[in-house]
């Protein structure tokens, strides 16, 4: 643990150049985006049919049709313009034909949304649907359902697209969308290409930012903010807090985030900034390098620390997936860290001692903590990898 201080201090020297991890190059020229192309003119009836089948057995084909439609908007010249825009951002672009042969008598899980489509609103609503589907790259089914039920209405209404609240929140439907929109898939790259195109257009940028661009920040940005706030609240040196959290991997995450922020800060052109952020999201190393389970656990601890100074902070834990036993343990670790530092950075027990004390306190109060079990059920119960012997 002693080396953690040296490693964290080394973040000051992180530059915009490449690190040892090839997945952190953030270079648009290494990313192949996909655009679906078609010579057909899509009627309202065809688009309604495709929308209704998103989340059903023909999800991939339906999303392909919708991607081709919003890319061209029934004008082949629009597809050429979209390709040029992305190439100018230094991405490689593959234009692939779309398979628009939808079968008959199929399930229609999003028929309610399809019913409200008109000639006037179908482009905007299809974009909104695709932007929402893009969140499945980062959200699991339970978190996506929570998003649709609690946040989508506010965002959709703010953009004049209140019809988006008709998107099905069935777990089975969302699971099929999630299976289609996975990292590295052509559909995923096509949707992210559409996001970029809309971010670059002043007429659509605000809507794209509101409905989907928040995912460009990624979990790392949130982690850095939580960590900084907890460090300030405790009056604890960052290196000491890292040691107490027993999370060496957070240093690697911090290095990647610091590097990304340095690169983005050095670029003046907004188009180039978005290209760098998107290359991070689509790079092969992104989903391999992030310890999502550990991030969830450390987020749980940090929020419990900040709750001691700003009541209501732990309300953000509703979407954080950790096991109920770990929630209890995180509360005790946070309490002991507050006691250790007492706002002035004073010395106290080491990391292993803190964890042992927290485990003991958590066991002693086991009968008083049914509320943690209830919270765990609300956000999906045990988190990924949340076995009892893997609390930390």
Swiss-Prot record:
Residues 345-392 are annotated as: Disordered. InterPro entries: Rhabdo_ncap_2 (IPR004902). The keyword ATP-binding does not apply. GO terms for molecular function: RNA binding. Homomultimerizes to form the nucleocapsid. Binds to viral genomic RNA. Belongs to the novirhabdovirus nucleocapsid protein family. This is Nucleoprotein. It comes from Hirame rhabdovirus (strain Korea/CA 9703/1997).
């Amino acid at each position: 643990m002693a080396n953690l201080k040296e490693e964290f201090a080394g973040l000051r020297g992180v530059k915009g150049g490449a690190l040892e991890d090839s997945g952190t190059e953030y270079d648009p020229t290494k990313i192949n985006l996909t655009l679906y192309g078609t010579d057909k003119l899509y009627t309202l009836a065809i688009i309604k049919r495709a929308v209704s089948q998103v989340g059903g057995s023909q999800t991939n084909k339906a999303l392909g049709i919708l991607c081709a439609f919003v890319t061209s908007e029934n004008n082949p010249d629009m597809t050429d313009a979209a390709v040029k825009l992305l190439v100018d951002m230094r991405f490689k672009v593959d234009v692939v034909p779309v398979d628009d042969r939808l079968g008959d008598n199929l399930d229609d899980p999003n028929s309610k949304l399809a019913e409200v489509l008109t000639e006037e609103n179908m482009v905007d609503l299809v974009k909104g649907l695709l932007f929402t589907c893009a969140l499945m790259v980062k959200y699991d089914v339970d978190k996506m359902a929570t998003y649709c039920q609690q946040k989508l209405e506010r965002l959709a209404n703010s953009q004049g697209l209140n019809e988006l609240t008709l998107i099905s929140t069935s777990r089975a439907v969302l699971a099929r969308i999630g299976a289609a929109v996975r990292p590295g898939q052509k559909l995923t790259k096509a949707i992210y290409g559409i996001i970029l195109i809309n971010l670059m257009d002043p007429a659509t940028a605000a809507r794209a930012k509101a409905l989907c661009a928040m995912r460009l920040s990624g979990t790392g940005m949130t982690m850095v903010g939580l960590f900084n706030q907890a460090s300030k609240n405790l009056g604890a040196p960052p290196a000491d807090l890292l040691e107490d959290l027993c999370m060496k991997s957070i240093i690697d995450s911090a290095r990647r985030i610091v590097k990304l922020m340095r690169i983005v800060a050095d670029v003046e052109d907004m188009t180039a900034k978005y290209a760098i952020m998107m290359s991070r999201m689509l790079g092969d190393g992104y989903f391999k390098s992030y310890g999502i389970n550990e991030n969830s656990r450390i987020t749980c601890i940090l929020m419990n620390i900040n709750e001691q100074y700003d009541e209501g902070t732990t309300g953000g834990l509703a979407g954080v997936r950790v096991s109920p036993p770990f929630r209890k343990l995180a509360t005790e670790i946070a309490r002991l860290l507050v006691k250790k530092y007492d706002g002035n950075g004073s010395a106290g027990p080491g990391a292993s001692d803190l964890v042992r004390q927290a485990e003991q306190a958590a066991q002693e109060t086991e009968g008083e903590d049914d509320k943690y079990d209830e919270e765990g059920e609300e956000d999906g119960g045990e988190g990924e990898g949340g076995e009892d012997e893997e609390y930390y």
